[in-house]
Amino acid sequence: VLFRSWLTQVPEDFRFVVKLYGGFTGQAKWQDSYPSMTAMQEHFLETLQPMIESGKLFCFLAQFPAQFKCTKENVAYLETLRELFNDLPVAIELRDYSWYGKEFIEKTRQLMRTLNFSLVMVDEPQLPDTVPLDTTVTNPNFSLFRFHGRNQAYWNDRTGDWRKKRTLYRYNEAELKILGE
């Protein structure tokens, strides 16, 4: 496995953030590759066991798509996800505003605390279809901050090599100072 060699090539105190396979977050159909969700989980964790055992895993990142709205079904799915990953560190990136609206933000934070997830702190352009920067710590053991940049010009542009342009952004000193506080 490719990543096994990484474990010996990084400094002793280096830790990896591993993005979950899209089957866990609805960005791929796990049914196309696995007979059950449990089989998917077992294969995923078995593959990453050397990283987990070495202590090089910082956390798993579950980046949910914007279609993952704040619904009872999706809350139940997050509970299932916690069961699948037991006590392993998992950071949850929610990309739909419904989780952050006035009606649900406190419930979202409490859900993350209850399930022992870290709600990812995301800095991205502030547009009608993006999520606000929420720096609330929901897991006292670890937090994850993702700097997507503030490139408003290309954020919603889905033409050409849009993925490369979308996050093409260099923070200035003033922005970094504010984010560092």
Give short role names for the model-derived ranges.
Residues 1-181:
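Residues lining hydrophobic/aromatic ligand-binding pockets adjacent to catalytic sites
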